[in-house]
Regions:
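Conserved N-proximal alpha/beta basic substrate-recognition cap immediately N-terminal to
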Residues: 70, 98-223, 235
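C-terminal active-site "lid" helix and adjoining low-complexity regulatory extension at the edge
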Residues: 23-30, 56-91, 108, 339-409
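Short helix/loop capping segments that flank catalytic or ligand/cofactor-binding pockets
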Residues: 60-64, 156-159, 237-239, 251, ...
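Short, flexible loop/turn elements at secondary-structure junctions
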Residues: 40-47, 56-59, 96-97, 134-136, ...
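Classical Sec-dependent N-terminal signal peptides that target proteins to the secretory pathway
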Residues: 1-20
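Glycine-rich phosphate-binding loop of ATP-grasp-fold ATP-dependent ligases
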Residues: 187, 201-205, 226-266
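Short hydrophobic beta-strand that contains or immediately precedes a catalytic carboxylate
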Residues: 51-56, 228-229
Length: 409
């Protein structure tokens, strides 16, 4: 019994990585020794399997729901422990000013592994130059280190591009997966392969042109009773609308035609996004329920958040899962409120925001993640337009790199 329990805990919380059947060209590893991404996924999870909804960047995420199950800073502690295995110098651009933020990013663990803070790009290069000699243009062409900088922040992006030119062999965290974060279309394309399709809900990408036949076509092709309408690039649950097939036509008309006059007050916040959404298309997914989660004597349709790192080393993609937890909506399944209030989990006006995933489900989740994520990471590397991996090609035996195309209508 004890041996079995130890095996389960090792599988759930072990730092060991998962290898995919994916091989890079021999010359890739000599030029690009290490890629490292810190990510989250939101997913629906039930007895039938796992449906991945979207990717997010771990360095940009709040982990209150996960840390509450352990301790403040636990999630970042796991990331630094993972990054330390490579034996490279670790850098974090701009030291947090307040104590709460320092605790959140597990500063003690970072410093324990000889991590160092730098205020900006010039401070970082100055610190590196203490032990390494730059070449004539001020760059360090052979320097290998792990650098975490939030390049999605407008203030930090110039620092990132400058450092990329001066440290061509450095590993910038989230450089690969960041191209797919909060991009629902690109995420969906990743899964259009045999062996990966089962990890995504059925969906359609539609042009923002309302016509009476649109709802009928969506219902006819997807054959669902309930749908989730989403903007392609909105973040943090903005603009998401849950709707039954009976209300699909009227809802499409509201968001595509009557943008300024929300018809249903309970959806007004979601509808507001559509009045200024810049995309010419949107995505419609089948609604997939999670296994009901009991909290405080009530059942909830929660969304599963998984936190993990992916890295490429020696021509192989690896995945390290840090944990998973349920994100709760504001209302229980049987409450007499709107569909959004019952099913949308990006809500912060509840005293209880999260719930743990039971051990048996965690083991089953790990098996599914071991199958899906390394293959997805290999595809990310292939399809990213990042200059670090231009020309690289990850081969996935048994699958093509160009899968079936979901119809746009």
């Amino acid at each position: 019994m004890l041996l079995g329990a130890c095996f389960i805990m090792a599988l759930i919380f072990g730092v060991g990585s998962v290898q995919a059947e994916a091989v890079l060209p021999n010359n890739f590893q000599t030029t690009h020794p290490l890629l490292l991404d810190f990510n989250i996924i939101d997913a629906k999870f039930n007895q039938n399997g796992l449906k991945i909804l979207e990717f997010g960047g771990g360095h940009r995420s709040g982990f209150t729901g996960h840390d509450n199950l352990y301790w403040h800073g636990y999630t970042w502690h796991r990331f630094w422990e993972c990054a330390a295995q490579f034996g490279l110098p670790m850098w974090y651009i701009r030291q947090p000013r307040d104590e709460q933020r320092k605790a959140f990013i597990a500063t003690d663990t970072f410093l324990k592994h000889a991590g160092r803070f730098a205020e900006n790009e010039h401070d970082l290069l100055a610190q590196i130059s203490v032990q390494h000699q730059p070449v004539a243009d001020g760059s360090f062409p052979d320097y290998k280190g792990i650098i975490l900088i939030n390049k999605t922040n407008k203030e930090y992006f110039p620092m990132y591009t400058f450092l990329k030119s001066k440290l061509p062999q450095a590993t910038f965290v989230c450089e690969t997966a960041n191209h797919f974060v909060f991009d629902k279309y690109r995420t969906d394309v990743l899964f259009r392969e045999p062996g990966l399709k089962q990890y995504r809900p059925k969906c359609m990408v539609c042009y923002k042109r309302y016509r009476k036949s649109l709802a009928k076509k969506i219902i006819g092709r997807m054959k669902c009773d309930m749908f989730v309408i989403k903007p392609l690039n909105a973040q943090y649950g903005k603009g998401i609308i849950f709707v039954t097939k009976e209300d699909l036509d009227s809802t499409l008309k509201t968001i595509l035609v009557d943008k300024q006059t929300p018809q249903r007050i309970l959806l007004s916040e979601a509808l507001e996004w559509w009045s200024h959404d810049p995309n010419g298309r949107f995505i419609v997914e089948e609604y997939v329920p999670s296994t009901p989660v009991e909290v405080e004597g009530k059942l909830f349709d929660a969304t599963l958040r998984v936190i993990f790192a992916m890295h490429l080393q020696d021509g192989q993609p690896h995945v390290t899962v840090f944990g998973a937890f349920w994100k709760l909506p504001t209302h229980a399944i049987n409450d007499d409120v709107s569909l959004n209030q019952i099913h949308q989990s990006y809500q912060y006006d509840r005293a209880v925001m999260s719930a743990p995933l039971d051990d048996e489900s965690l083991v089953r989740l790990q098996v599914l993640l071991q199958d899906a994520l390394p293959k997805v990471y290999a595809k990310m590397i292939n399809e990213t337009n990042d200059q670090r991996v231009q020309g690289a090609n990850v081969s996935l035996p048994g699958t093509g790199l160009h899968g079936s195309v979901v119809a746009s209508i």
